[in-house]
A protein has these predicted regions:
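Short Pro/Gly-enriched beta-strand edge/turn motifs at strand-loop
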Residues: 8-10, 20-25, 129-131
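A generic structural signal for short beta-strands and their flanking turns/coil linkers
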Residues: 22-24, 37, 48-50, 68-72, ...
Length: 159
């Protein structure tokens, strides 16, 4: 990271930023092309490591790319706001507040029904703040759930 003065390294502070984010952009490599998709997500923390959970249709480009090459990049951000810190009539008089997390990891499908249910519970809890969901078994069977085991991540904040 070029701006070390903006880097957040404390795992608790990084996860506090993740907690404020509600959309994660996943980047896939598709035969030399880049495919990026914004997704709602949930996460699970184990010390300084994270697992991100997502859901979607069982077929489509995401699922094909996970099967083909599980390596992914991700980005999430929160608190974006452009404001003036100087002369309001000069473009360079503006800057932006934000907090962001970027990283890489390996994506895989979740097949086990209990893990799938737990992953959806985590995702829904992060998205709407509620736990103890009832899942219709037909819907559970119809949805694809996948996870990204985060291998590297960095966090940046600018106030």
């Amino acid at each position: 990271m070029r701006r070390k003065d903006r880097e957040i390294t404390d795992p608790n502070a990084i996860f506090a930023v993740i907690e404020q984010c509600h959309v994660c952009r996943l980047g896939f490599c598709d035969d030399g092309d880049v495919y990026i998709v914004p997704l709602h997500f949930g996460y699970e923390r184990d010390e300084a490591r994270a697992t991100l959970y997502f859901h979607g249709a069982q077929e489509g480009r995401k699922m094909a790319l996970i099967a083909k090459n599980p390596r992914v990049g991700f980005e999430m951000d929160t608190g974006a706001e452009v404001y003036t810190r100087g002369a309001a009539d000069v473009a360079c008089g503006y800057t932006a507040r934000f907090q962001s997390v970027i990283g890489t990891g390996s994506a895989s499908l979740v097949h086990d029904a209990n893990e799938k249910r737990r992953a959806l519970e985590i995702l829904m809890s992060h998205s709407v703040g509620k736990r103890d969901w009832t899942f219709d078994e037909r819907m559970l069977a119809a949805v694809a759930v996948f996870k990204v085991e985060v291998e590297k991540m960095s966090c940046k904040s600018h106030e």
